Swiss-Prot record:
Residues 1-16 form the signal peptide. The basal body constitutes a major portion of the flagellar organelle and consists of four rings (L,P,S, and M) mounted on a central rod. PANTHER family: FLAGELLAR L-RING PROTEIN. The gene is flgH. Its main location: membrane. It is found in: Cell outer membrane; Bacterial flagellum basal body. Assembles around the rod to form the L-ring and probably protects the motor/basal body from shearing forces during rotation. GO terms for cellular component: bacterial-type flagellum basal body, distal rod, L ring; cell outer membrane. This is Flagellar L-ring protein. It is a lipid-anchor. The keyword Protease does not apply. Keywords: Bacterial flagellum, Cell outer membrane, Lipoprotein, Membrane, Palmitate, Signal. Belongs to the FlgH family.
C-alpha cells in the first residue's frame, strides 16, 4: 500500500516538473560564436560538377560573372544582410453538403392448381415482396484564417560556394532580455546577382530558405506543458 502511494506521489511530482533543476534561477546561456562557419564543408552538395579552374594569364575568371572586383559577398567567410519582411494573409472557407437517398421495392407472386397426376390439391398462393431504403448524408465545413507580419534584418555568413557560383548562407542572432532568449536563424542558397549593391538580399530570393524565429527561457517554459504531462499525453490512450 505504501509503495502504491509513493508511486502515485512520484508521478504527481513528475507532472509538475517544468524546469530542469540546473536551470532554476538562471538565465539561458548564449550559444558560442561559430567563427568556423566560413570554412564549413557541405557534403550534401558534393554531387555537383567541379568548378572550372582559373586560367593562367587571363583577366577573365570563368568561376565568376563579374569582370571587376565586387565588394558584395561572394566567397566563404563574407557577410551579407538578409532582409525579412513577411506580410502574409490567408483566408480559406470550405463547405460541403452531400445527400443521397435510394429506395427500392421488389415483389413477386404465384398460384398453384390441383395436380393432374395425383389429383391432390397441390395449389396455393404465394406473394413475396422486399422493400429497401437507404439514406446517406454528410456535411462538412472548414475555415482557416491566418495572418503573419514579420519585419527584421539579420546578418548571415557565406559558408560555401556551389559549382555554379551560388552561395550557401547561414546566419544566427540571439538577444537575451532578462531571462528570455530570442533566437533567429536563417539559412539557404542565394545567387550573387540577387545581392544588391549595399550587400543586402531579400528573403524571397533565398532558395531552400529556412527561417526560424523563437526563443527559450522562462516565458517559453511557461507556455510548454510540464515534462510529466507530456509523457502522460504520449502514453495515455484517452
Amino acid at each position: 500500500m505504501n509503495k502504491a502511494i509513493l508511486a502515485v506521489a512520484m508521478v504527481l511530482l513528475l507532472a509538475g516538473c517544468a524546469t530542469k533543476p540546473e536551470e532554476i534561477g538562471r538565465a539561458p546561456d548564449l550559444s558560442p560564436v561559430a567563427a568556423h562557419l566560413g570554412m564549413q564543408n557541405n557534403p550534401q552538395f558534393n554531387g555537383y560538377p567541379a568548378r572550372p579552374g582559373k586560367a593562367s594569364y587571363s583577366l577573365w575568371d570563368q568561376r565568376s560573372t563579374n569582370f571587376f572586383k565586387d565588394p558584395r559577398a561572394a566567397t566563404p567567410g563574407d557577410v551579407l544582410t538578409v532582409i525579412i519582411s513577411i506580410n502574409d494573409r490567408a483566408n480559406l472557407d470550405n463547405k460541403t453538403d452531400r445527400e443521397r437517398v435510394s429506395k427500392g421495392i421488389y415483389g413477386g407472386g404465384g398460384s398453384f392448381a390441383t395436380s393432374s397426376i395425383t389429383g391432390a390439391a397441390a395449389g396455393g398462393d404465394m406473394d413475396a415482396s422486399v422493400n429497401t431504403h437507404s439514406d446517406s448524408k454528410s456535411k462538412g465545413k472548414g475555415t482557416i484564417e491566418r495572418s503573419e507580419d514579420i519585419r527584421l534584418q539579420i546578418a548571415a555568413i557565406v559558408t560555401d560556394t556551389l559549382p555554379n557560383g551560388n552561395l550557401i548562407i547561414r546566419g544566427s542572432q540571439e538577444v537575451r532580455v532578462n531571462n528570455e532568449l530570442r533566437v533567429l536563424n536563417v539559412a539557404g542558397v542565394v545567387r550573387p546577382r540577387d545581392i544588391s549593391g549595399n550587400n543586402t538580399i531579400s528573403y524571397d530570393k533565398i532558395a531552400e530558405a529556412r527561417i526560424s524565429y523563437g526563443g527559450r527561457g522562462r516565458l517559453s517554459e511557461i507556455q510548454q506543458p510540464p515534462y510529466g504531462q507530456q509523457i502522460l499525453d504520449q502514453f495515455s490512450p484517452f
